[in-house]
Amino acid sequence: PDHLQEKWFPRLVEDPSFLLAHALTEPRGASDRWLPYNAPSANMDTRAVLENGQWVLNGRKHFISNGFDAKLFVVYANTNPEVGILDGSSSFLVPRDTPGLTVARCNETMGGRYMNNGEIVFDDCMLPEDHLLIRDTALQKKTDTYSNPGRIIQAAKNLGVGVAAFDDTAAYVQEYVQGGRPLIQHQAVAVRLADMAIKLESVRCFLRQTAQALDAGVAEAGQMITMLKVHASEEVLKVCQQAMELHGGAGTMLEMGIE
């Protein structure tokens, strides 16, 4: 709605500390929102009920990126328990200071520490009726418009991590001497470095192909994006593991960056 854009967009643009978080994932069923279910039993546990001109939200969200510090939340909730998740869920704009909203905890994560991870609880959280963003059946199409580019960006981040690990390793094996010669001159090491390069190039090519398909509106773009997420994360993990092994004991030291 225009009035919500006028109120919140300037703060989101002008204040770097004014963060927005998407509250989707739940303790039971994780991100079922993105799976091709449409049975009532697969709908969200977080409920939103319209009572006397106000939406009343009850439920819990967890693993929410920026959830601990966010000042504004886009919350996804079940608004029609008679149908499945694709047709019976809606999104709402919920300010952090709304009565009934509690940021319960900040989760410590092994990776992705560039943003925090929070758990959000809604206990009779009351919203004005006009804080509804997208209702029921229109939600799936609308959310895909921002989530698909986000998935491609995540794959690009993975690629960047892999490239950094490869570059550090390539420099290390040229400098470190064992058996009277640099590690790179040992064929077993060179072969592993080549394998790392092949994996990264496959991710890079698939990433470009998928981004082009999304821009062109190719029907299979959504499927390609899902495949890209898997391919990028798995191949980059293998690259980073090999990078650590080629560093030897130094690969476990924090000062090296590989760990």
Regions found by a protein language model. Give the residues of each.
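A short core secondary-structure module
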Residues: 58-103
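Long, acidic (Asp/Glu-rich), low-complexity accessory segments flanking structured domains
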Residues: 123-141
